UniProtKB/Swiss-Prot annotation:
InterPro entries: CENP-L (IPR025204). This is Centromere protein L. The gene is Cenpl. Transmembrane segments: none annotated. The modification Phosphoserine is found at residues 40, 54.
Amino acid sequence: MDTYDSQGPTSRRRTSNLKDYFVSATPLQKRLKLARRQSSVFPSPSRRKIPQCSQLQEDIDPQKVAFLLHKQWTVYSLTPLYKFSYSNLKDYSRLLSAFIAAEKQKGLAVEVGEDFNIKVIFSTLLGVKGTQRDPEAFLVQIRSESQSSREHRQDKVLWTGWFCCVFGENLQETVSEDFTCLPLFLAHGAESNTSLIGGWFQKTFDCCFSPLAISAFNLSWMAAMWTACKMDHYMATTEFFWSVPCSPQSLDISYAIHPEDAKALWDSVHKTPGEVTQEEVDLFMNCLYSHFHRHFRIHLSATRLVRVSTSVASAHTDGKIKILCHKYLIGVLAYMTELAIFQIE
């Protein structure tokens, strides 16, 4: 069973001033809003496509995909990067390495240890996109080499973050060539390192990170869409977690369902081939509520859904996500990209 941190994402001075950021960039704000109205990529809130395996995934390095899976990522939305260039990734690696070393020299909270040589590596994630027009995703890693491990030349990964845009190419078309739109950022590692690196990106590319909370409404959609995915074999039980506010402390309820039973339930309410509708999501969740009430006499509709876990992925309202299935990597990221774009608008 996955464990999730109860701590919220690190607060940053600019995070709470997202609207202020757009006040100083009014033309960009207008273009983003226009994109949302005109874009045919983002379906209406009442209807979405069932995630499918993308042909572009064939370009993804299998080792990099394996590294992305089965890790708990904290998700953020990110405003467009100004003057970012893929041809300068080596320079960014050098500059960020120097920045981290300088911050550590100042005695700031940089969790890299005492006896390590730190290096930062920027690399592209080819194939992590929805269409050819989406900007390339890229990965940032903080690696270290201790005195004792130099003979073996094995680097230890201390922190990882990646930036992507999946089926969000219309957003890129609304901004000038000086901006690169990668609205979804995922981080794994010490929160202090996330804050430090986020600060460097904000200063270097005039962008703004904001923690991406996932609502109970969004979790219901995730549960339905991921249950609808056809699996070659199921790797995990389908689980739901609800929070019950009560005194003196909150009560949590977990509900585990065999994945084949969950799929059978979904098939019984699913009527629109290739799509998921709001009505089907509501029916799916209401059937779960009714079944639970019949057995335990508890009204789950009076509680708050805080986490869902399937063989495709798991997600928490705290903005934590874990992708479990390579086949549906792009499908999961597409929905997360949509949520990130809606948040920055």
